[in-house]
Design a protein with these regions (language model features):
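Short beta-strand segments
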Residues: 1-2, 81-82, 110-112, 171-173
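N-terminal short beta-loop-beta anion/metal-coordinating cradle
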Residues: 1-84
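Flexible, glycine/proline-enriched loop segments at strand-loop-helix junctions
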Residues: 3-7, 80-89, 139-147, 177-181
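Structural motif
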Residues: 27-28, 76-79, 106-108, 166-169
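Internal, conserved structured core segments that host functional sites
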Residues: 75, 83-134, 156
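Catalytic cores of processing enzymes, dominated by hydrolases/peptidases
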Residues: 117-201
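A conserved C-terminal secondary-structure "cap"
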Residues: 178-267
Length: 267
């Protein structure tokens, strides 16, 4: 799940979910959250367009859920890619929780992108956390530690946890000096980590060429500014001396499957 808004810098998270949908064997809409009570339409205006016959089409902000059929023996995947609502976050979280329960989900993964001190010359780091302590330990993820004012995603995570659903949050750090959309490297990094943690093939390699082109474009811009080039070099040193934000290894997907089996047996 990913929503356009404060925690989707450069559209990296929603691009990742949209890529999963477009890569599926098939997709079926299973739910649509009515935008009427959740949006201030003076801030998020509907879009009018013309079809092939010249008839006007009005498109309202959408938060739709799709069930995707994937390759192999992977169970179906339900995705929500939409827009962060302005109003009634608690009611919106309840709507998402209802979709998750009706679809039989036991795990919800939210994707996000935030501006950070990340050099564009390095693989972009992904921060991961899990609401379930056993799952967090098995996957080498942290537990949520933030305290203070929160947004829709924070309210959503709490509600899903109260429903008994495990929640994993994956957030990629986007270079704060280049936040324009699209950012194929950020999208690739999110998809790669999602695949690593869940074992679901995400096709992240398809972003490799676009990510390289994006990096070359930023390289050229940075090279023309001595101060910026020096700043990026300092960021590189900082990142090179830090540890990876998520563990690597094929055993992570196996650990997730073991957790799902254990929780099924307990239920």
């Amino acid at each position: 799940m990913a929503l356009e808004g404060l925690f989707d810098i450069a559209g990296a998270a929603t691009d990742a979910v949209d890529h999963l949908a477009s890569s599926a064997i098939s997709q079926v809409k299973i739910a649509a959250i009515d935008p009427e009570v959740f949006f201030d339409f003076t801030q998020q205006r509907p879009i009018v367009s013309l079809d092939d016959t010249g008839a006007r089409i009005l498109r309202w902000p959408e938060n739709d859920a799709y069930e995707l059929a994937l390759d192999g023996d992977v169970p179906s995947l339900v995705t929500i890619s939409g827009i962060e609502p302005h109003l009634r976050w608690r009611t919106f979280a309840q709507a998402v929780g209802e979709i998750a329960q009706k679809s039989g989900a036991r795990l919800v993964v939210t994707l996000g992108a935030m501006a950070g001190q990340a050099p564009h010359t390095r693989a972009l780091g992904v921060v991961g956390s899990a609401s379930d302590p056993v799952l967090a330990e098995r996957l080498g993820l942290g537990r949520p530690t933030y305290q203070g004012p929160t947004g829709l995603v924070g309210a959503l995570h709490v509600h899903l946890h109260e429903l008994g659903l495990a929640v994993i949050s994956l957030r990629v750090s986007v270079p704060h000096y280049v936040t324009q959309a699209p950012n194929p490297e950020a999208t690739r990094s999110l998809l790669a980590r999602l695949e690593l943690v869940t074992g679901i093939e995400t096709g992240h390699a398809s972003f490799t060429a676009d990510a390289a082109a994006w990096r070359s474009k930023v390289d050229a811009a940075v090279a023309s500014d001595d101060e910026m080039r020096s700043y990026v070099e300092r960021l590189e040193t900082l990142i090179d001396n830090s540890q990876d934000l998520l563990p690597s290894g094929d055993e992570l997907a196996a650990q997730l499957q073991a957790w799902l089996r254990d929780n099924t047996d307990e239920g």
